[in-house]
Amino acid sequence: GKIMGCFGLTEPDHGSNPGGMISNFKSDGDYVILNGSKMWISNSPFADIAVVWAKDENKRIHGLIVERGMDGFTTPETHNKWSLRASSTGELIFDNVRVPKKNILPGKSGLGAPLMCLDSARYGISWGAIGVAMDCYSTALKYSLERIQFGKPIAAKQLQQKKLAEMLTEITKAQLLSWKLGKLKNEDRAT
């Protein structure tokens, strides 16, 4: 069979500061008790498992695998997003969730492991942003060719041409930057 997963690091009050997370777990025999929440998590409303990052009793960050159906684990969907509407997004809420200790990811603690995953995700996100920018450019170009002012398309005006050229220059710079990063990643030289 197939299993869908999600990655839970971002918290409601600590989105750009993962070190400030408050999600935590405490030892309880062969289990840990997980409390806290995550927000803006892609695939959370239907994921079978969630790789979640939380602090232990010593304030060290660890990854845990939380399975759908565990008591106290809910995944409400976020509605009315303004962007990335093709992906289902939601929250991960942990209310005294009993997670087996065997579900703690071995060998990694601290922020290094989750941030490594984010670095790869951000590379992909850069291409998505470039795609959006390219669509904006195409829309602006089409509009400037169709919009007639004083008997001519506004695309015939030097100021409009300058704005479109600057737009395309910035998009091309972003493409080249992301292409170069991809090349470095393929060569294991991205730092």
Where are these regions (language model features)?
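A short, Trp-centered hydrophobic/proline-enriched beta-strand micro-motif
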Residues: G1-T10
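Buried hydrophobic positions in well-ordered alpha/beta secondary-structure cores of metabolic enzymes
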Residues: F7, L34-G36, L64, F94, ...
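Short Gly/Pro-enriched turn/cap motifs at secondary-structure boundaries
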Residues: D13-S16, W40-N43, K55, K81-S88
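A structural signal for short hydrophobic beta-strand segments in well-ordered beta-sheet cores
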Residues: S23-K26
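A short core secondary-structure module
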Residues: Y31, N35-T75
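Glycine-rich beta->alpha junctions and the first turn(s) of the following alpha-helix
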Residues: T74-T172
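Charged, glycine-rich active-site and insertion segments that engage polyanionic ligands
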Residues: D188-T191
